[in-house]
Regions:
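Conserved double-stranded beta-helix
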Residues: 49-53, 69-134
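Short, small-residue-biased leader/transition segments that mark boundaries at the very start
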Residues: 1-7
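Non-heme Fe(II)/2-oxoglutarate
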Residues: 8-72, 95-98, 188-277
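Double-stranded beta-helix
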Residues: 127-193, 213
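Conserved hydrophobic/aromatic beta-strand scaffold that supports enzyme active sites
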Residues: 15-17, 117-121, 131, 171-173, ...
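Phosphate/oxyanion-binding loops and surfaces in catalytic or ligand/nucleic-acid-binding neighborhoods
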Residues: 37-40, 79, 125, 141, ...
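A short beta-loop-beta micro-motif enriched in histidine and acidic residues
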Residues: 103-115, 169-170, 176-177, 199-200
């Protein structure tokens, strides 16, 4: 996808999709590493390991630094790029898992709201698999009030969703093949619904921000420089993954996650992702 088209679509509709980014070998490597970890632990990958997983796993570190992903992100937010967060989204086969209509940046406490999410499909993420649904142009709204819910099938840790009626007749799907990604604005209304396929739907969502964005949260935020230079130093600097899946790395990851969840869950009426201090 050319730079001008990427910029235009992002400005007009709030999203860009699909964008080809990964080779089959890169897809296989990511899936193999995820499945190896699951085999070692004896259970499907879940919180906290699925969150900020670029600080645990080589495949995730590779993807947050992937040049094709960063080239497309740079078209939208410029050359100096921080990774603010990243999450592995796994919908089991034939599951009731869903994500409510929401705006990503509601509890990110970033100013200005120039955050963009790259959602990378590691398996097929079509309509049957519960691909992302978006409301084109909704990113031109301000942040709308959200509320929390405790539905165990809601994949968002604090269960947040828009506290308004969403005009879903305007929604469009963003189906992706494995190896493709979508990009969407932090204010874009989006959701996803049940996976009706016989296989898991696996996607990797990466939150990118330009270095000039300021942290306005009560709890300071960490961020990882992935391209360019950071002359602003608005975030606590994060070290790049050094020793994948080592005890030292697990400890560092846990410290980052405690900081992040404290920040994200402030004022939450419910959270599936609280971590003890």
């Amino acid at each position: 996808m050319g730079s001008e088209m990427c910029i235009r679509d992002s400005h007009n509709s709030g999203f860009v999709s699909p964008v080809d980014v990964l080779t089959q070998n890169e897809i296989n490597q990511s899936i193999n590493e995820i499945e190896n970890f699951e085999e070692e632990t004896g259970q499907p990958i879940d919180f906290p390991h699925k969150s900020r997983c670029h600080q645990l796993f080589a495949w995730a570190d590779y993807l947050v630094h992937h040049p094709k992903i960063l080239d497309a992100v740079e078209d939208i937010i410029g050359p100096n790029i921080l990774c603010y967060h990243a999450t592995l989204w796994v919908k089991p086969a034939k599951s009731n898992s869903f994500v409510r209509w929401h705006q990503d940046g509601t509890y990110f406490f970033l100013d200005p709201a120039k955050h963009v999410t790259a959602w990378v499909a590691l398996t097929v993420a079509d309509e049957d698999a519960g691909c992302m649904q978006v409301i084109p142009g909704s990113h031109k709204n301000d942040f709308i009030d959200h509320n929390d819910d405790a539905d165990p099938n809601n994949m968002i840790p604090r269960g947040q969703g828009l506290a308004i009626e969403v005009e879903t007749e305007a929604a469009v799907g963003m189906p992706l093949q494995a190896g493709q990604m979508s990009l969407h604005h932090t204010k874009l209304f989006h959701a996803s619904f049940n996976n009706m396929r016989d296989t898991r739907r696996i996607g990797f969502g990466i939150s990118y921000i330009p270095t000039e964005v300021k942290d306005i949260g009560n709890t300071p935020a960490n961020a990882l420089l992935v391209r360019g230079e950071d002359k602003n130093n608005n975030f606590l600097p994060e070290k790049r993954l050094a020793d994948p899946e080592s005890q030292d790395q697990f400890d560092y990851h846990l410290s980052l996650m405690k900081q992040f969840r404290k920040r994200q869950d402030e004022g939450a009426s419910f959270s599936k992702a609280k971590l003890n201090d």
